[in-house]
Amino acid sequence: MTNNKGSIYRQMEELFRFILTNVEQSKLSTKNKVQIREEIIGLQSFVIGARPARIAIVGRRGAGKSSLINAIFGEQKAEIGDYKSQTGSGKWYLFENELGGIEILDTRGLGESHLPEEQAATANPIEEVKQSVKQKCPDVLLFLCKGKEVGARIDEDLQQLLQLKQDIYAMHAYNVPIVGIVTQVDELAPASNSEPPFTHPKKQENIQATVRILEGKLTEVVTTPVTVIPISAYVEYDLGEIIYDRRWNIDLLLDYLITELPKEAQVILAKLSKVKSVQKKLSRNIAKSVMAVTGLIGATPVPIADMPIITGLQISMIGTIAMISGDKLNRKSIMQFIGAMGINVGMGVALREVSRQLVKVFPGAGNFISGSIASAGTYALSEAAIIYFIDKKSQAEAKKVYLDKLDKARNKEQ
């Protein structure tokens, strides 16, 4: 991903430097400057520091590791070993498409009775994984267990999982989160209800029973509550196209994973998900962060001289939402959106200069801008950007949302 960063990323970096410089030169209090600087650096990590999520997947042979990778992408990225353990030595693999990638720590199947088709370098699966963990720290550990096997011989696997968690902390001082995943719930009884969303009462009862069992076992071993998500990842492909799709709860898993990941790993996974609800949730979380900054700046009336801080942050927010949507992040798409809101800025102007020009047309611009209006403008822009980039609505529809949200905020001010 880093190699693909071009001029737009340089402009975004310049924009963030411009914002931070304006913060330092502003008449804001020292306390506020420190808080605002921390928020801005956090926001910067979403775009400038964006990288693939690093996910370690642990589970026995046949637990569905490769199927899960394919289900996340909606493409056949990992080979599935039907009879022998397909996974070789524990090492990092980058699975990617045009939207981005995920780094997967590919573990040998725990408890396997056959050698993997990719010959492992050492005999102990957990030792192989430890070698890779030394190289890169996983963002999250996924513990996969088949629905039919949650009560069968997984205690040893759980102890190895705990050891891995402890090793990660010892190596990286990182308390890695664990997510339990019950796989292949479509195969639970009754077999007659094998299609999502599995509404049969007995099916749901069996699914929830497996979740409770795995929750109990994981919590007992790692001594802290662990979220467990039941899924079905079964998909059939022909010539690269999906011809049968039995995926269930993959969107729920992705939504939860994003909340557990570091900021720099969230945007690319949201892009890859292609799930609008996931993309919107992350976009709104980012918008809330920007609103917090604009509200803090406007705790007292904001001098026009300090306004480029607010408008600069709003531009960075728009660019981040565009990136989350899966659109190629470029200056043109940001400028087209700004133009759609009725704000005319020269197309050849650098983003940092755009933030200066936006001050002239900012809602309510006078000698001072109140914090509530600044936050309202940020909120209105974020909702319009979500409509435009994620929902793929027209410029007219996005502008209507922007004006409606802004009018409601103005009415509250009166």
Functional labels for PLM-detected ranges:
Residues 2-112, 319, 328, 383:
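Conserved G1/Walker A P-loop phosphate-binding module
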Residues 31-36, 42, 54, 233-295:
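C-terminal-of-GTPase-core extension/linker across diverse P-loop GTPases
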Residues 110-112, 147-152, 186-189:
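Short acidic, S/G/P-rich loop/turn micro-motifs used as interaction or catalytic elements
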Residues 176-177, 185-265:
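Canonical P-loop GTPase G-domain recognition
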Residues 286-324, 328-379:
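Membrane-inserting effector segments that mediate pore formation, membrane fusion
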Residues 382-414:
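Hydrophobic alpha-helical transmembrane segments of membrane transport and translocation systems
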